[in-house]
Structures are given as C-alpha cells and as structure tokens.
Amino acid sequence: MKIKKVLVSQPKPATEKSPYFDLAEKYNLKLEFRPFIKVEGVTVKEFRQEKVNILDHTAIIFTSRTAIDHFFRICGELRVTVPDTMKYFCISEATAFYLQKYIVYRKRKIFYGDKKVDDMTKILLKHKTENFLVPLSDIHKENIPALLDQLHLKYTKAILYKTVASDLSDIQNLKEYDIIAFYTPSGIKSLFQNFPDYGWTYRLLQRNVLL
C-alpha cells in the first residue's frame, strides 16, 4: 500500500526544520497534525480531596515546566503564599530557570540535576531533613517516588494536573488517512474514546520506528 496521508497525534512543530517535514518531502507525504490529548489542571475541590497541605512541606521536586505551572496555579487558587524558605529541586537546569517566572531565582534554594533522575541522588542526600512535595500528573512514572523511597526521604505526592482526551469530533473520516501515528497509550485511549463505534484497520507506529 502506498502511503500518502498521515495523521500525527501531536501538535504541529513550531519550526519548519522539524524532521517531520523532511520526511514529508522525501516520501511525498501529506501530514496533518492534531493533538489527541491535552493537559488540564485539577480543580481546587479535587486537590482538597487529596488532603495534601502544601505548607507542611519544606521542599518541592519539579520534573517539568508543566508541574511548575500547575503548582503555582493551585497555590494561587488556594491563596497559599509559598514561603521564601521553600527549597526547589529540579530535574534539569532548564526546568530550574523556568522558576524565574514565579519566584526570585536564588541559587541557595534552587538545585537541579542533569536531566536524569539518578543525578538527583547526591543533591537529595545533602538535604535529608527536608519534607518533599512532588507535583505530578495523574499518569506519571514512579522513578522519582521510587528514588525517594530508596533514599528513605520523607515526601508526599500531589496530583496537580491530568492528561485527558481532546475533542476530535471535527475529524469526519479517519479512513482518509493511511497511517495514524501515536506516541503514548493516552493518545490511543483518546482515539477509542472519541470513536468508540468506529470499525477500521489502523497501523500503530512507535516513535522509535518512524515519525
């Protein structure tokens, strides 16, 4: 079967230098981009049901900019003032610098690794007495909690945002696409949530195979 039209279940790249467009030109493909999932913040009511007191904690571990955004969002909605004594531990330098959007950047209270969870070990061990808060999505890896357990550190997980299906009702006919490229199980779940009764044959492409 000759592949002509591909639906990519992600947002359109911001730059024309993306490999997607190189592939499209090389193989004469028509690419359409449509995010199948989106991130929504939990409501104040949902957060309160978790029974997490932000101010009980002396340090926060951030794994992404999204986690930072939703932490300060929920603090604003709860009218919680984060004390200047709060310490921040970030997965990477880029994530740490993003904190400047919300706080004054002070090196003595902001720490970061080199994009890998294991890089955080030495840093965290220097702060054994802290009570850590870990903002997460409803769908998350357990690598950070597992590391904290391994190091016998005190922490609390807080679900501050969630991955939900996008509304795809404007897509009239999935059969017009020769391939639909997925990158997460959530994207596939969104497909069947939007088209529960749609009988068709599709090809799943993993990121390490194509696109």
PLM regions with names:
Residues 1-211:
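Conserved beta-alpha
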